[in-house]
Amino acid sequence: MDKQNLYLGIDIGSTTFKAVLLSGDGTVLRTVYKRTQPVEAGKVACTGHCSACGACSGGSVKRLALEFLKVAGISSFSDISSFVVTGSQIVEDTKKFLPYDFQVSEVTAHVAGAKFLHPDVDAIIDCGGQDSKCMVYNLPMNLWTSMMSGVCAAGTGSFLDSVAQKLGVRIEDVADRVNYDSKTEFSSVCAVLSATSINKFKNRVPLGDLLAGACKAQARTILNSVGQLLLNAPGRKILFQGGVAFNKAVAYFLGKLTGSQIIIPQYHEVMGALGAAVIARQLHDLKASGHLNLEKVVYEPTRGKSVALRIKSTKHDFFSKDETKPLVWRNLFFPTEILNAMDCRVRTLETYAALFGRRADKVKEALGRAAQKGFDGQTCSFLRMLEGMDLDKPDFIVSTVQPCQQAERVFADLAREYKIEDRLYSLQTPINAHSRNAVEVMADGLAESVFEMEKAFGRKMDLGRLEEACVLSNEAAALAKKCQELRFTSPPLVRGSEAIYNAIVFSQLWGRQDLVDIQKAYYEELLMKKEWAEKRYKIGDTHRLLWLHLPPFYDTRHLDFIETTCNAPIVFEETNFVGWEPLDPKDPYRSLAKKLLQSGFLDPALRVEYVKRAVPAGQFNGVILYTHGFGRCSLADRALSKHLREELDAIHVPLLTLEGDCMDASIDPCSTTTKIASFAEALNLNRYGNIFGKLNETK
């Protein structure tokens, strides 16, 4: 082949290998779409030093890539000007076998490929063997928004593969054998249980009807899992790409369901690889121009006094054996000013469970014991941890009805198990902060809880100490607000992947001098870090992300990926936001009731309102919501994410929802990093005009 700039894009999926070779003038020189099989025996990974036999999975990929190039007249990777990879099967070891220049997310690759062929496209559905994706261009935001399916294979190529295999039909022949007028419907679109659905029908309806039911189910499930982005845009042109687009029947039923024009583009089966090749050309041009600036955001490295103070308080609170003080279990929301004023040993159970999050053996053991007691994955993993752990027997238990009623049931179960049902107090809390008489009802409830604890402990509440606790709480809150203001109005000062674990909203130190000392030290540290950061960055030099809800506690991998790999700082975290008015020490119960109502976590509407106010105040250009429990947690459920997305759309700020579990690493979706990467790439494209990052200023 004549010497010219050549750009290679490779997409390694769960069931296929795709590659595209692009010339310098944008001509598609060669493509390949090849189904792959798992390695039957032997190694699946090695050092990559030989990589000639192709016996391992990495070697096999390299062999396929070199064969692809050889047919095009290219002898080695060194003849390629720029090489970009994408796909769900790109892993850390892939670099040993494929000398690529950049890894792009599947979402961005599919958008780039689609726009290369159809520059006016603004809606895309991609359906592959492992996941399905929907990408829609949001004109007011000037960026692509996307959704990806989670851990379930329904709605992906795996489902139709299993159906075709069960019916003895080649997957390539399915569309031609479908009865497009059939009324047959499948109730199940589970790729694993598809045999059950088929067996229910196969001896009663013709083959064409069965295939029609499967294809309709496929189309419906694609829309159910990722098609929400298309709900407000009927009649638009949608590109349907990926391996499933070979099946024109699925495209037909997608058109029926959406009322839109479904277009299967040329090269639909290799669109991710085509997009990777297009991006390889963009990367080559930017590097050649010398404008690309890939420097990472850095932070003032001093580990401050506040960290040591937090560690000291945590160890004292959660591992103290001082039996002269009554032990009280609480949930995340019952006011600790009351418990600290009564000189209790406080144990916030959800926080206690989280402390063991990085001990995989402890988590596995606790979840296993909880399962034996009947608590499966439908129950919050924090609560399953509590059901499976050995806990010190408390003298009293306090909790709140909102925001987690599931926790109420588990707390009641634990009280029964520990034989202290008569020492459990559940504070009635409304879901709406503006409910009539909400403050009075809660204030009466707090007073009643104190009365019950006084009976249990055999001593009275010292109202002077409660007044003092309110004063200390106000001091800590005022300092927290100053810290908040500093972080809102400065370049990134600390890594969000570290600050998120402060979670002061849920702290059990409210009402104690400890929290005042911690927040004072933290504020002084932030002042120093602000001076350091402002010598290096302006506030608009970086992305500014707001993190909502809790993080995974088993490791910081996803947070590190956001901040380090994607170079997108998490500037602030919802769990460190203080938005309530100062307490009135002379009216403690009413004040604490107001504090609880104004925290935002009891009232979803108020919580969304806080986020809307925070976005302009902190100049955030992206928001991330971690939906613990895959949206089953009431603090991050589908209703909240829907409301949040609608409100953020109205102010043109993108929301990324990450499904996962804060405690159970075994069910972490493999698509999480893809979602994060595509979000960061979209932000880069919006802010810098390219997906890679900041450009050097030109004089």
Report the location of each language-model feature:
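Short glycine-rich, Thr/Ser-proximal phosphate-binding strand/loop in the N-terminal lobe
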Residues: 7-59, 143-146, 150-151
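Gly/Thr-rich phosphate-binding beta-strand-loop-beta motif of the actin/hexokinase/Hsp70
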Residues: 2-25, 121-141
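A charged, amphipathic alpha-helical module
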Residues: 298-326, 443, 447, 451-580, ...
